[in-house]
Amino acid sequence: MRDYYRVYANIDLDAIHENVVNAKKLTKPGTKLMAIIKADAYGHGAVEVAKTLDDVADAYGVAILEEGIELRQAGIQKPVLILGYTPKPLYPAMIQYDIATAVFTWEMAKEIDVEAAKLGKKAKVHIKLDTGMSRIGFRQDEESFEMICRIAKLENLSIEGCFTHFARMDETDKTWARKQFQRYESFVK
């Protein structure tokens, strides 16, 4: 019979901190940094990584509401953004825990606005643009622009930002990533 061994990872939080500090040095002064710590910080421990990066990260990005709630319950006060889809039944908890979500349809924005009004609060959202990932997000066209303008007028929403997801950033050839960035930049101007 073969011997089986448990696999484990030894996470060097100091190295993570140093990597983020060095990455931030490459940005322009005043640039804000959102640490993406979805999927338990990719298996590194979301709460531990968030606490380690508290002095360098301006916000945290997660995949689902439950990950954001875990951060809040661990005492993380900085802004948290759900990068993906948040189901309608979870809007009240999202608003109560002061967690922002990606918005990518008029209907979604309107439903969040209604829930925020019921709670007497403003819901925080970020506009998600689809520049080439082809999953979720507003396209760069006149119809989307008009919808985003309508969303901006909703009384119980606070639009905190706008973002996109680069489809092939890990590839050596950055042609597609540059094209996505140009689409993004062109639309938000």
Task: Label each PLM-derived region with a short phrase.
Residues 2-3, 7-10, 17-18, 31-189:
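Active-site-proximal beta-alpha core segment in soluble small-molecule metabolic enzymes
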Residues 26:
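Conserved PLP-enzyme active-site core in the AAT-like
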